[in-house]
Amino acid sequence: MSRHFFTSESVSEGHPDKIADQISDAVLDAIIAKDKHARVACETMVKTGVAIISGEVSTNAWVDLEKLTRNVISDIGYTSSDVGFDGATCGIMNLIGQQSPEIAQGVDRSNPEEQGAGDQGLMFGYATNETPTLMPAPLYYSHRLVERQAEARKSGVLPWLRPDAKSQVTFIYEDNKPVAIDTVVLSTQHNPDIKQEDLVSAVMENIINHVLPAELLTEDTKYHINPTGRFVIGGPVGDCGLTGRKIIVDTYGGMARHGGGAFSGKDPSKVDRSAAYAGRYVAKNIVAAGLADRCEIQISYAIGVAEPTSISIDTFGTGSISEERLVEIVREHFDLRPYGITKMLDLLHPMYQQTAAYGHFGREPFEMTVGDDTFTAFSWEKTDKADDLRKAAGL
């Protein structure tokens, strides 16, 4: 029997980098709600008392960027300088400019199916059958811990919590299957009047034991709750936040490879985002079809070129058919050109702020309505291709 450990981390919606991601995606949503064919690349920086919004946009839509930014910050829970940031009073700087026409000429086409990739690059998708969501267990439970932290804070279960938090979970694997949790780390911002011993017991009861299955916890499981002691100063006062700084948290927690491109603030013409979503869709359907226990797909592109420059698949020795045959089946059943991805996953809707905290993958698809627009968020998490893939594989 082989035995190893694997660790993943997550951060809360109040982490400075996640504030930036949520603002960038809120800007994207506001624009795409009015102009589905806008080109958006929005970058945000937050630091003590200020939010700087920059990037490139091509659209005729008007967005009240200041109001939008203030609402995002306040909704997260930053409503007072005592907490470390105040959405109502912080300074907001708008540095957004026009997209370069040289990029547009390489991407835009009269025939939309020939739309070129917005940049070169390589993207990965991954799935594993070790959790019901087909996500790696260490990341899945890390996300659930900080998601529960926000829920306990906002619902009043633990009203002395503040928005900034981080989690980390180490799993023990035996023969590549997760069997137990070795270590749990949870650091959460809090009001100054809560005692450390009270915080530890409340977090243990209302967050950790609320989220982590008892069968995965043992007498040897180690817990580090606010291991440095006080965590009163947090958010953008404690650290500068930037869009795109949590790409491993956003994806697979280090269990799969990453091409390096961030997601938030980018419209679907940017393959950094859309092709990574498509990669997850492909890998998840392969695993859901029973064609592999684990699957990682790499897709690559050249700027201005529609067809992927390469597609490769690794099933880590768990596949029921050859990887070469899997690539053939994927080419037959998935259109991985930029326009094809956008159409296949129905991406031209204002759904992206929903993705900007607690992971872009492993979430349940659900119906959203924004104005007159009704659509499915997290469409890349559907397993509607699994039966077709199984039949194509002859299983």
Swiss-Prot record:
Cofactor(s) demanded: Mg(2+); K(+)
Residues involved in ATP binding: H15, D164, A165, K166, R230, F231, D239, R245, K246, A262, K266
Keywords: ATP-binding, Cytoplasm, Magnesium, Metal-binding, Nucleotide-binding, One-carbon metabolism, Potassium, Transferase
Source species, domain of life: Bacteria
The record's free-text note on cofactor binding: Binds 2 divalent ions per subunit. Binds 1 potassium ion per subunit.
Catalysis performed (reactions): L-methionine + ATP + H2O = S-adenosyl-L-methionine + phosphate + diphosphate
Family, similarity comment: Belongs to the AdoMet synthase family.
Protein name in UniProt: S-adenosylmethionine synthase
Organism of derivation: Colwellia psychrerythraea (strain 34H / ATCC BAA-681) (Vibrio psychroerythus)
Taxonomic classification: Bacteria, Pseudomonadati, Pseudomonadota, Gammaproteobacteria, Alteromonadales
